[in-house]
Amino acid sequence: MENCFDSKKYLDVVIQTIKDKAEKTKGKLYVEISWKLLEDDFAQRILPGYDTDNKKKMIIELKRELDILMCVNASAIIENLPMTKKAIPCVQHLEHTLKRIETVTGIKPHLVITNINPEEMYDIIYNIEISFQKKWYKVWELYMKKWFPYNKSFLLSENGFWNDDHIPIMKKIALITGIGNGNWKLSTCIWQIYQDHEIGLESSYVMFQTFPIYGLPPEHPINQAWAKRRDCETLSLDDFGETTEEGAQQSFNIIKDLLWDVVEDDNLIKHYEKASDMIICPTLECIENLEEVEKLAKKELEE
């Protein structure tokens, strides 16, 4: 099949955009990966020419400036919930994913265990932490926050964010990824930006994703096929007439609510007027044959 997607252009734009945003950030730049870190089987199916190693190449290109944080919810670990289509237990999947990231990228990820209830979970979580520390992983704790993200006064107090570990990011950029639902990737970014600010580091946030495509309407076959793949993620038009998905819109609202009054005026966050402003997604500009991609997306919807 003829290539419909310029993978080199896509990779170049993503890398340069991340570098540009990092240069505009005085502290650390936290880059949330909205889907899987290393592969995207959906993109491969509907974007002929999409390089399966795109994200790997991006990470390797930025390697000297990059740390990776892997987030997982404490409840998923304790219950050892099944992950992936093969129902691999959480702890086993976590071990495999961490090892694979390190093997593929040469970067040893930090492990961030989130949503810990210390009154009920601490002994079990402590033992899990020890097992990963014996494999030379740095392990960090984020505690349960009741009524997050609505209890702003509590979150911005000594009993809120300051109870969590402040992860010492040594590089300029931190990629934030995770496994399982409710992994608290966004929360991890917010905790870090807030705590960085309190010690004089003016850090910021962006999200990196391949889909949905904001320059196409919600009902476009490409966006609908992606929504089906993500189990009916809600797509709609925002106040600016751009496609937005529910998760990204919620993230945008939370970031603006919790960090707007914290960060300085020249922070990237202060310049985000809509969800798409905080998202790196050059997919549309790299599609060379939109008609053919539409056909593949429609086929995906029919299956």
Annotate each language-model stretch with its function:
Residues S187-T188:
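Hydrophobic positions on the alpha1 helix immediately C-terminal to the Walker A/P-loop
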